[in-house]
A protein has these predicted regions:
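C-terminal structural segments of small proteins and small subunits
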Residues: 55-88
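A short, structured beta-strand/loop element
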Residues: 31-49
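Solvent-exposed beta-strand sheet faces enriched in polar/charged residues
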Residues: 22-24, 46-48, 82-84
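A generic structural motif
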Residues: 51-53
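A generic structural signal for short beta-strands and their flanking turns/coil linkers
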Residues: 17-19, 39-43, 75-79
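N-terminal first-folded block
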Residues: 1-35
């Protein structure tokens, strides 16, 4: 079963307490998709935090994936990530 957007937001806030975070549930765009059939969600997240300063895009995404690793792939099937520093 997929997490609610609010549950995903809270999980990300635990790992990135100083970040501005938005979560969008895109699961409805994927009806009939193999991952959606199992109940796992499709989400788009944006995080803006100074913690990402000096990090490559790959490293930024890895930090976000690490925060939800135990939810993938059974609760989250797809996660689109924008991880930026303030002022970008």
């Amino acid at each position: 079963m997929k997490p609610t957007p609010e549950a995903l937001l809270q999980r990300l806030k635990q790992h990135f307490p100083d970040a501005h975070i938005t979560v969008q549930d895109d699961s409805h765009h994927h009806r009939g998709h193999a991952g959606a059939a199992g109940g796992a969600g499709h989400f788009a997240v944006t995080l803006v935090s100074p913690v990402f300063a000096g990090l490559s895009t790959v490293r930024r995404h890895r930090l976000v994936y690490d925060a939800v690793a135990d939810w993938m792939p059974h609760r989250i099937h797809a996660l689109s990530i924008r991880a930026e520093v303030p002022g970008n």
